[in-house]
Amino acid sequence: MTDETVKSLAEEIQTPVERLVQQFADAGIEKTVSDSVSQKEKETLLAWLNRDKDISTGQPSKLTLQRKVRSTLSVPGTGGKSKSVAIEVRKKRTYVNRDVIEKSQAEEQALREAEEKAHREVEEKAQREAQEKAQRAAEEKAKREAQEAKKQAEEKAKREAEEAKREAAELAKREAAEKNKVKQNDKPKADVADQDKARRNAELAELKRKTEEAQRLKVEEETRAAAEKARRLAEENAEKWTAEPKAPETESADYHVTTSRYARDAEDESDAEVEGDRRRGRTAKAPRAKKNNRHSEKADREEARAAGRSNKKGKRKSSTLQQGFHKPAVAVNRDVIIGETISVAELANKMAVKGSEVIKTMMKMGAMATINQVLDQETAQLVAEEMGHKVILRRENELEEQVMNDRDTGEESEVSRAPVVTIMGHVDHGKTSLLDYIRSTKVASGEAGGITQHIGAYHVKTDKGEITFLDTPGHAAFTSMRARGAQVTDIVVLVVAADDGVMPQTIEAIQHAKAANVPVVVAVNKIDKHEADPDRVKTELSQYGILSEDWGGETQFMHVSAKQGLGIDELLDAILLQAEVLELKAVKEGMASGVVIESYLDKGRGPVATILVREGTLNKGDIVLCGFEYGRIRAMRNELGQEVQSAGPSMPVEILGLSNVPSAGDEATVVRDEKKAREVALYRQGKFREVKLARQQKSKLENMFANMEEGKVSELNIVLKTDVQGTCEAITDALVKLSTDEVKLRIIGSGVGGITETDATLAAASEAIILGFNVRADASARRIIEQESVDLRYYSVIYSLIDEIKLAMSGMLAPEYKQEIMGLAEVRDVFKSPKFGAVAGCMVVEGNIKRNNPIRVLRDNVVIYEGELESLRRFKDDVNEVRNGMECGIGVKNYNDVRVGDMIEVFQVIEIKRSIA
């Protein structure tokens, strides 16, 4: 029989080929679609597939059921109506064949008991061997010590016997000598001597016996002591060797009562009853469900106790849940990463301590802080090191530096580039007209009021070379624009009208040029007028350090006329000569970088930014990072509105595709990765917000009274929308400078583009007026403005805007009140009147006395009363006015202490309106 392939087997059993290949792989058999399958491999696959089934019945050991219960719920809606909501409860439950489980558990139990039995036998055998080994070692040691003790005792006894023998020999020798002497001297006493000799021999024998007995007792005692010592040693070693080795501590399995059999049955019954309650109204069976719940809880507790008892009997660790946290015995030193700024709460979190501990440490170091206060890097480092942690300082702009370093700036040498020339000067001195003549177009006519209100960047090709011109506004409100123009320029052309001389913005332009260290070329314009006086211009400029070459200075003075075109060629020659002296060069290849000259929001094209390229080549499709914004260039246009594909150094272009309107003056850089550009832009936005919050000072003691007075200050809220970003900055700066101590001007919203519905809603909510500069409101915004009666004003010239805001703020100023003395009367006599009390008979000595005017009563030129003139009579007639030199009767309201000689002064309060200068 030929083996069939995997594909034919899949067709035979009607299963997908990929699934069969995967099942073979799961079973440990690597097969492809075209491989053959043997009978043995089929049996292996079948055995693997039946691993979860009962072999005897072929039924699965596990069964998973999914249950769905659908019901509806009435939910009250608007207008008192209720609506039905369909609810579907899905449950998934797994049932296990208990016979298979119990069988496997029994097998596991038997296997576990066999393992325990084998383990016990091995332990008992090892214990017996250890005991026998210890006993043998003790016996050998005791035997060895006994032999040594016996040997020592024998040697000692031998030595003592030899000494006793030697003493006996000496004694016998002495006795023999004495015996010879006795025989010679006294023969008859021989019997007595024999008796003494016998007695001494008996004493020697007794002494020898006692010595041997003492030696034997001593040896036996030493032997017993050695045996006892060996026995104790054997017992100690046996305890050590037979001690059961400590089992490694293992994590106790979490015991959950719902995993038991009875708990599962109780849970199933409870679920069934709850579902029945939902079908029948949920009222009748609720107590039973509660009872069943109590029953299941009781069963669970009993089962848990039984499990605990069985664990105790089996000497196994209890499986109940226990808390696993242990308080560290020693302080933990951490590596704390600190950026440029960090709050107290964040610092405490990184050190894993409470915020109060950090505040306490700072107080000990002499610094007061709150939980949300932002700390600088040095302070945070000192605090962390004081608390025993290691500090790792991290630069916040690490990602930004990485992105900027990963740029292809070009390897080629630098080439000459066109000079960037900024035309500066006082308003109406002819800057735009001069540039207009050079470009041979009429730009000035397009500006409202004939004055420039945003920077214009133009690239001009002349016969003598290329020049990039920047035209800046001359009005006082555009200081930031002129400063920005001076920063990106190479040469400043200072335009001064020959008939007007040096003006405030001319001086400011000189200061900007000196601050930027930029050479200046002076163009004395309007030279064709009869009132022109070029020498006066030279004299006035010399006072500010601008000396003509004729007078020994370094500045070129060119006499031009923008109307008639006089001296224009000479001016261009002077500019190109100055550029040649500066040797202006830039890298042409590589990723571009430049400066945002101007930006605005176009309704059809979105955010538009005018960029002056400084180095490299800016191509369509490049990813640009501009300050807080980023994006891919979708289109590029030159100053003539023509589409271009690339722009080199010193070329101004308009780009489309940024995420939002960038701020004028931001640096534009081409980067590789759009994702990293977005991260850098978001980081810059967050950093700007942090710096802004850090600058906001809390209310302190020194400015407490100023804060108390703020409630009395009138506020004028303004929503400002302009056509370009630079104009918005200029108007904002000019308006903020109008604020005084009594009237505060707040710009609650500003932006570039048309007036939208959001702007109108903001103005209505904050009671603000909307100022539109060269922009208009759309239909939805106009509807809200009409409904809420919001004050909306359009402007195209900045003079008119500032003047009207001054008038509005003047109307909010509190008026001044001045007292003017109208007349003075001398009291000549005092009369009593039942109606008015004391009436003063007076002579008018100065001015006129009018009725119902406030008066003062003077006595010895000291004011003693201030009140109101109640009654004025001449003779018996009531009059409204009494002139100088006439007599009258005056009744003072609520005052009766009028005396002769007093002076009555009549005055009036005049209201004087104030205005903002």
From Swiss-Prot:
First-listed, main subcellular location of the protein, grouped into a coarse class: cytoplasm
Disulfide bonds: none
UniProt domain tr-type G: residue ranges: 416-585
Source organism superkingdom: Bacteria
Keyword Protein biosynthesis: yes
Biased composition (Basic residues): 279-293
Pfam families linked to this entry: EF-G_D2, GTP_EFTU, GTP_EFTU_D2, IF-2, IF2_assoc, IF2_N
Chain positions covered by the region annotation G1: 425-432
Region of interest called G5, as start-end residue ranges on this chain: 561-563
One GO MF term: GTPase activity
Gene Ontology CC annotations of this record: cytosol
Annotated protein name in UniProt: Translation initiation factor IF-2
